[in-house]
Each structure stands twice: as C-alpha cells, then as structure tokens.
C-alpha cells in the first residue's frame, strides 16, 4: 500500500528545525557578545587592547592576573547563576501554571537568605557547599509555605505573589533583626542580600559547578513530566503521571538550583521571573519551542543574558568604582520589577468579583461599637504612656507626672523630652497608615491590600530618601513634599497602568507590587552610591524608625491627618458602596472613577506623610483595618476610627519594644511591625486558601 504524503508536511519539519536553531543561535550570539564586553570592564585599567594582546601571546602578567583572579570568575559566576535561575523560574512557572511564579515571588530567595543569616548569627561559619545546603533547606520550606497558602498557584497570580511577598518581607525583616543583634558576626551579609556576582578567584564557582551540572541534567531528564503537567492534572494522570510526586520533585529541583545560585552570589532579584518572560515572547511566535527540553535551555540562555547584561549596564553607567560597590542584584531587581509590571498590566481579572473586605464581618450593634472604641482609646493611651516610660531607661508614673509639671531632674527632663516626639510620631504614623490601608482595601475590594502593596510607600520612601541624600540641607517640609510627590507619582503610574482595559483590582495590586519592588531597588542604589553599605542609614528608611525625631517633624503628618481623616469619614458611604462591586456604584448613580481616584489620592498623601515622619513601615495598613472590621463590622464610618486607634497602638508598641529589647541598641519599629504583621497576613491567606470555583 502506497502512502501519499503532502509535500507541505515534508517541508514542515526542516523549517521548524531551522526556526528553533535560529532562536538558539541568536541567543548564543547575544550571550557571547555580552560576555566579551563583560570581560573588558572592571575597576583596573585592563581594557580591550590588553585582552587582545594577551590572546595573541603578547599580554602582560598583570593582565593575566586580573583576568584570572577577578574578571573570569565574575563572568563564570554570572553564567552559572543565570543558568540556574533561568531553569528554576521556568520550572516553577510550569509547575504552578502561573506566569508570575519565580524564586522571588515564592519566597525561595528570602528563605535561603534567612537560613544563611540565622546560621551565621549562631557563630557557625560555613564554606560554600554547606552554606548552599542551608540555603536549600530554607528556600524549600519557604516555597512549601507559599505554595500551600496559594493552593499551589491555583487561585491565580495575585494570591501567589501576595503570599510570597508577605513571607519574603517577614523573612527579610527577621534576617535584618539578626544582623542588628550580631553586626560583627554577620558583617557583609547585608550587602550580600542584594545579590552580587563579584568573586575573588574560582574557588566558590568551582565547588558549586558540579552540583549545578547534575541538577540541570536532572531537569532536562524531567522535561517530559513538565510537558505532561502542562496538559492539566487530569490529562497527566490519565497518561500515567503521578502528578503530586512529579510536582514535588520538580519544585525540589527548582529550589536546589536557586540555593546553588544564592550560595554563589546571594539572592539575585527577579532573574527567575524575567528570563522565562523573555522566552515566552519567542514561544508566542515559534510554538515548536513549547516543549520543555527546548524551553529549559532557552530559559537558561535568557537568564545568562539578563544577569550579564545587568552587570555590563551597571559598570558601563556607574564606572569601575560604583560598579564594584553597587550589587548586580539591584539592576536585575529593577528590570524584574518592570517585567512584573508588564505582565501584571496584561493580566485579566477573573470573572468572579472579589468579596468585599467587610464580607463575613457581620453587622455589629451600636453598643458594641461604643465599647470597642472606648477600649481602643484606652489601649492607645496606655500604649502612649508605656512608650513614654519605656526605653533604654525606664521611668515611673511619678517621674512622668513630675515631667508634665516640669519639676523633674534635668536628666529626666532630657530623656522624656526626647521620647515625646518619638511616641507622637509613632502614634500619628500608625493612625495614618491604618486609615490609608482601610481606604485601599475598600477601593480595591481586597482585604489583603495595603498602601505598600500599591507602590505608594515605596514611592514616598524614594522621594524622601532622594531629597535627604542629594539635598542634605533641605528642610522638613521639603522632605515631606518630596515624599508626597513620590507617593503620588507611584500611585499615578500604578493607576494608569492598571486602568488599561478596565481597572481590575487584581491588576491594581500586581502592578503596585511591581512598582514597590522597583522603588525599593532604586532606594538601595541611592544609599549604596552615596554611602556604601551604611547599615544604619539603610535601616532607618527601609525599616522605619522614630530615632532622632523632633516635634517640628511631626507637624506634616498631623496636618495630613487633621485634613484628610475628616474627609474620609465624610465619604464613608462612598467607601461602603465601592467595597461592594463594580456595578452597584454605577446603578446608584455614583461617579465610581472620581470617587476611587479621590480616595486613593487621600491614601497616598497619608502614606507620604507617614513615611516622612517615620520611614517605610509595612503591614500596619493591613492588620489594623482587618482587626477593626472583625471588631465593629464592615461599615467604614465605624471601621475608620477604630482602625486608626489600632494602627496608632500597634506602631507605638512596636516602637517601645524596639527601644527596649536590646537597649541601649534599638530595633527599627518597621521590623517589629513586620514580624507581627506578616504572620497575621499569612494567617489570612491560610483562612482563604480554597481555590476559586471554576
């Protein structure tokens, strides 16, 4: 029997091979070109002509020494880290079926970093391979927690990113706490946190390379399992795949690759997110690349390209000196944040309307509201009194009374005069962030949202830090205005990008988180370039601190609260309506777009004022509104004042704890609020972890 074959079909296979080969050829050519440029850069005077002379046999010994001791190890480290994170990101996105899954968004980097810091703080000094094992355990535990809270990504990208970011913030805060407790024993780990491929010799990369090769081979061998998982759990099961076991083993492989990269260069931000995103651009035009035995090597090429290009751009723009001081991970984080914003801006919300933040809170009686408010006022007053009494030197109530009457000793007057601005700034900042968080949650209809997750806190911090660093003589109001401008610019960018194709609440949160990550990376660049690795300066603004505050410095936040809070209370009905769904405000004739914009602008201004007073604080705008709704119900007329009191108490207590635990040393209030708020946030995710229907 003769089989007639369509000539077009005969030509299809060679054409496909040519297209696939062309993609890999272009990728290899790009990596080769970037690597060649990379070798010509450095802090020494060795340039392209010296390297060419060395290749032709006429180079100097100094050139060879620089190449072998510094530049080649840095290049090899960049290649290994790029390959590892490219593979890891591709695997995690395929397993979770989520384009935003990556070592960063799953908390793997943060878990690995915390494990290494915790081990070092115990006085245990580990070489490269054991430190990689410690990082692997920490990263694996973090990934397991995030995937469990987000139902393995089945509930969509928003929950996955929220869970990973919350856990990451908590672990980084805990790591910073350990750094403060043992600054001498953990020296260098703060800088290592940002990720840097600089190496002194081949020792580190030589030890990790064999482990990476074995893990990469295992990933390629598992390519068919990844292809089957992409078909869906039911289809994969029918075809004989044990889905649970396959998914678990692949996650372990991805975490192992990430741990290896962390052991070599520290947590290099967002390479595992950006590399697969670049690959998907090629896959969209060349479907033949969709098989994982093609996707994985292509993801590795993209990862190497991202890492080396970031390092080349860093040293090209900043020169040899700052190219050494500013870590490569800062540039990859900025690029990765842009990729996150790009992906999020194209994200479509699920058809199901998110529940109102007040859903399930029930209706509370007026009597209960009065009792709760009275109790909250009492707790806030008590927190303020304890804040005045506590610190490196504890005083008694009688001493406090004497200070009020101005009859205390000179030493006591000095201590309490210095504490008053700190206590007031903590109270006011906590209240402002709580009100802002209540507004943000109502507008986005997301009980897990807060000002930081919309990029507002990051923008405000960036504006304030830029003025403080570059205009050291600037006055208080200049810093406040800069923080307000930064917050409004960040908010405007988030709002504009999220509004394309309809303002979806999921999209708003995802874009906001991208802006947050980008702004924090830019803050790191400013701090490093100005005063490299000044830990106190970095922690003051990145962790939130009341240290050194004076009474005039609380005036801006007081003005913001006195102005905006009554307006927010007056608009409680609009907030209640916006918190329901997209359609109800329109049916009632409410201008939804205008109301939403005004509410978020108010939240941005309150956040900016809080940042100018105390620095960047996280989770206050999440915990306080949620606790208030649980106590007094979902109506904003009641939620707003109670949330403000809870937020004020929370930050005041956090500040007092930070001033007392390791006195005379101090822990920034932001670290304490993160250590309190992050577990609460994760508990909320656990409560609502069930997958969306359909």
Feature annotation, model-predicted:
Residues 2-694:
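Alpha-helical transmembrane segments in inner-membrane proteins
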């Amino acid at each position: 029997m003769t089989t007639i074959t369509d000539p077009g079909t005969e030509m299809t296979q060679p054409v496909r091979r040519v297209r696939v080969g062309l993609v890999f050829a272009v990728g290899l050519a790009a990596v080769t070109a970037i690597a060649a440029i990379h070798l010509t850069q450095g802090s020494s005077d060795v340039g392209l002509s010296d390297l060419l002379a060395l290749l032709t046999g006429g180079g100097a010994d100094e050139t060879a020494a620089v190449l072998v001791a510094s530049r080649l190890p840095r290049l090899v480290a960049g290649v290994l880290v790029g390959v590892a994170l490219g593979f890891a990101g591709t695997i995690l996105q395929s397993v979770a079926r989520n384009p935003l899954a990556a070592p960063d968004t799953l908390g793997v980097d943060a878990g690995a970093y915390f494990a290494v810091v915790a081990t070092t703080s115990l006085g245990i000094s580990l070489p490269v391979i054991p430190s990689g094992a410690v990082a692997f355990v920490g990263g694996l535990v973090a990934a397991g927690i995030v995937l469990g809270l987000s139902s393995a990504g089945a509930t969509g990208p928003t929950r996955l990113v929220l869970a990973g970011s919350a856990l990451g913030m908590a672990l980084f805060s805990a790591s910073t706490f350990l750094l403060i407790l043992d600054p001498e024993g953990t020296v260098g780990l703060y800088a290592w946190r940002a990720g840097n491929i600089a190496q002194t010799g081949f020792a580190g990369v030589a030890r990790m390379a064999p482990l990476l090769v074995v893990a990469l081979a295992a990933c390629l061998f598992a390519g068919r399992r990844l292809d089957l998982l992409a078909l869906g759990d039911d289809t994969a099961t029918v075809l004989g795949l044990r889905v649970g076991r396959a998914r678990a083993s692949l996650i372990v492989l991805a975490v192992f690759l990430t741990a290896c990269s962390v052991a070599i260069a520290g947590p290099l931000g967002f390479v595992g997110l950006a590399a697969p995103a670049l690959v998907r651009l090629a896959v969209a035009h060349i479907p033949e690349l969709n098989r994982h035995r093609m996707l994985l090597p292509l993801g590795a090429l993209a990862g190497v390209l991202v890492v080396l290009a970031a390092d080349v751009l860093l040293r090209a723009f900043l020169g040899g000196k700052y190219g050494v001081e500013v870590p490569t991970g800062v540039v990859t984080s900025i690029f990765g944040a842009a990729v996150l914003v790009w992906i999020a801006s194209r994200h479509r919300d699920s058809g199901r309307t998110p529940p109102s933040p007040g859903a399930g809170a029930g209706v509370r009686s007026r009597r209960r509201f009065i009792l709760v408010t009275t109790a909250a006022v009492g707790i806030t007053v008590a927190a303020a009194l304890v804040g005045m009494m506590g610190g490196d030197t504890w005083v008694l109530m009688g001493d406090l009374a004497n200070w009020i009457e101005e009859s205390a000793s000179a030493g006591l007057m000095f201590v309490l005069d210095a504490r008053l601005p700190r206590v007031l700034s903590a109270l006011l900042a906590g209240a402002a962030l709580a009100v802002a968080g209540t507004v943000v949650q109502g507008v986005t209809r997301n009980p897990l949202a807060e000002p930081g997750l919309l990029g507002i806190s990051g923008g405000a911090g960036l504006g304030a830090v830029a003025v403080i660093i570059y205009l050291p003589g600037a006055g208080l109001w200049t810093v406040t205005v800069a923080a307000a401008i930064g917050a409004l610019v960040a908010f405007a960018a988030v709002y504009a990008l999220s509004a394309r194709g309809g303002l979806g609440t999921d999209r708003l949160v995802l874009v906001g988180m991208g802006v947050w990550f980008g702004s924090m990376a830019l803050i790191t660049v400013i701090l490093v370039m100005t005063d490299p690795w000044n830990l106190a300066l970095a922690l003051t603004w990145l962790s939130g601190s009341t240290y050194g505050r004076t009474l005039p410095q609380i005036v801006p936040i007081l003005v913001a609260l006195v102005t905006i809070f009554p307006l927010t209370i007056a608009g409680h009905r609009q907030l209640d309506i916006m918190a329901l769904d997209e359609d109800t405000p329109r049916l009632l004739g409410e201008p939804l777009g205008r109301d939403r914009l005004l509410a978020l602008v108010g939240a941005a201004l309150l956040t900016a004022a809080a940042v100018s007073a105390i620095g960047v604080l996280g989770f206050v705008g999440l915990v306080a509104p949620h606790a208030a709704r649980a106590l007094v119900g979902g109506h904003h007329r009641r939620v707003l004042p109670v949330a403000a009191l809870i937020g004020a108490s929370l930050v005041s207590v956090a500040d007092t704890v930070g001033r007392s635990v390791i006195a005379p040393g101090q822990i920034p209030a932001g670290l304490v609020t993160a250590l309190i708020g992050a577990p609460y946030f994760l508990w909320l995710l656990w409560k609502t972890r069930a997958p969306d229907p359909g």
